[in-house]
């Protein structure tokens, strides 16, 4: 991975396995990371594991609060944002046959 030293990055869906791996790689590349997800205990585990990341609990399905979340996350990262890794996923229905 390229050098990301000093880059401010938000990772959504960070409390799951894929999010954990993304954060690990970004951390190795030197990025400043804010991890978000719905399970605060998992986010706190990430903070303990990597030490230098910031965490912010957020449920991406609250679409009316996304702008506020990004503003708060950007402030936590020092006022600038370089990238958002949209790893969080939501689904409205669990039957693939009904999804289009």
Please report, for each region that a protein language model flagged, where it lies by residue.
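The beta1-alpha1 cofactor-binding region of Rossmann-like NAD(H)/NADP(H)-dependent oxidoreductases
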Residues: 58-69
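Conserved mid-core segment of classical short-chain dehydrogenase/reductases
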Residues: 67, 91-100
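NAD(P)H-binding Rossmann-fold N-terminus in SDR/SDR-like oxidoreductases
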Residues: 17, 21, 91
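Flexible N-terminal pre-Rossmann segment of NAD(P)-dependent oxidoreductases
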Residues: 1-7
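Conserved glycine-rich Rossmann-like NAD(P)H-binding loop of the short-chain dehydrogenase/reductase
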Residues: 29-44
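Conserved glycine-rich cofactor-binding loop
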Residues: 8, 15-16
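Aromatic pocket-lining residues of Rossmann-like dinucleotide-binding sites
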Residues: 26
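Rossmann-fold scaffold of SDR-type NAD(P)-dependent oxidoreductases
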Residues: 12, 81-88
